[in-house]
Amino acid sequence: MLLLLLGILFLHIAVLVLLFVSTIVSQWLVGNGHTTDLWQNCTTSALGAVQHCYSSSVSEWLQSVQATMILSVIFSVLALFLFFCQLFTLTKGGRFYITGFFQILAGLCVMSAAAIYTVRHSEWHVNTDYSYGFAYILAWVAFPLALLSGIIYVILRKREL
């Protein structure tokens, strides 16, 4: 049981790291001397050093991506907190439904954000020299991992430690 708890805790922390990195790092779109994320657009030198950054546009779709990414981080942090609370207060044989629910919500939020960004980013950057950066890919990787950990939480029963 202890190994199972450590495994699910490791998976949850990995999802949290992926969500934080994908929300913060300026690598959602990468192009010729430019990097773009949810918050700003930056120009870079040939060596990769950031030269100038300016705020991203204020379009509604980008604000919805920003909001859903922030919600995914909040839901995942809340799920981790609830997991620790339930670990010490849940009766033997009880399931971690609330923790699983919030972790699944985090997964659905990050999926929504990445899907909206996928569909709408072409309006923002009509230049075809852009490709998806690693932060965008990390957001998509966080989606199935968050769903998986949420499902594991729902299935998991508390036993004796």
From Swiss-Prot:
Cytoplasmic side: 1, 92-95, 157-160
PTM per Swiss-Prot/TrEMBL: Ubiquitinated by the DCX(DCAF13) E3 ubiquitin ligase complex, leading to its degradation.
InterPro entries: PMP-22/EMP/MP20-like (IPR050579), PMP22 (IPR003936), PMP22/EMP/MP20/Claudin (IPR004031), PMP22_EMP_MP20 (IPR004032)
Residues that span the membrane, as ranges: 2-31, 65-91, 96-119, 134-156
Pfam families (UniProt xref): PMP22_Claudin
Membrane topology category: Multi-pass membrane protein
One biological process term in Gene Ontology: membrane raft organization
Function: Might be involved in growth regulation, and in myelinization in the peripheral nervous system.
Annotated protein name in UniProt: Peripheral myelin protein 22
Species of origin: Mus musculus (Mouse)
